[in-house]
Amino acid sequence: MPSRRLHSQPDASVHPWLRRPSGRQLVADVQRMAIPELTRIFGQYGMYLRPSAEMPAELSGNMLGRVISLHRTSQGFDGQLRCADGELPVASGSLSLVYSLFCLETSPDPAHLVGEIARVLKPEGAAMLICANPWSLARRGPAMGVARAERLGREAGLDCVRCHSIGPYWPRIEGAVGGQAGGRWFDGFRAATLLVMRRREAGLTPLRKSPAAVGLRPGMSAG
């Protein structure tokens, strides 16, 4: 197993804007606006993928029994587990939620990462994919458009059930921006997009049991 990165060494995968007060405030605003969706998801286990070790490891607002918290590194993810993007060390179909915060756009292979997210989800489990909006003036790092993120999810077997524009419109340092994720036309310029996707399993339709055949005797008629 490779040696752990020393805390004094900068993580090459963390973009400088996340280290600034404005970047940390933007992340806080985005997560605050995602809480209404987060509180709709219940279950025993979940996973939180965050963009930096400097971000809090706790996923505030979750309704799960336990959340595995990992952070982005130049080699993949580290934290409670260490792994590459395409090799999440979790059993298939074991999680009720995977919450990815600005991790798809920093992945060397986002298709593999989304495929792994879909694999570890239970049937009807939810993936909350938060990506930086390429059209926003608030973001300062890499971004991923909602169309591409949704396509990656569909190709991995996930269905999009809701999509929200969240976060501030402009970079700021002071307190959190007011408002809710909504349907105003200019919401498309917010800092991030939240896709809520679910893993669908084709269910088997039970066949009705046919009544036992009755032989007709002379003098009997059907009906």
Language-model features: locations:
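Class I SAM-dependent methyltransferase Rossmann-like catalytic core
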Residues: 1-40
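Class I SAM-dependent methyltransferase SAM/SAH-binding core
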Residues: 32-88
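A short acidic, Gly/Pro-enriched loop at the edge of an enzyme's catalytic core
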Residues: 86-98
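A short SAM/SAH-binding and catalytic strip from SAM-dependent methyltransferases
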Residues: 96-109
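A short glycine-rich, Lys/Arg-flanked "PGG" loop and its adjoining helix->strand segment in the class I
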Residues: 111-123
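Conserved class I S-adenosyl-L-methionine
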Residues: 126-150
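Short alpha-helix
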Residues: 142-167
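C-terminal lobe and adjacent flexible extensions of AdoMet/dcAdoMet transferase-like proteins
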Residues: 179-223
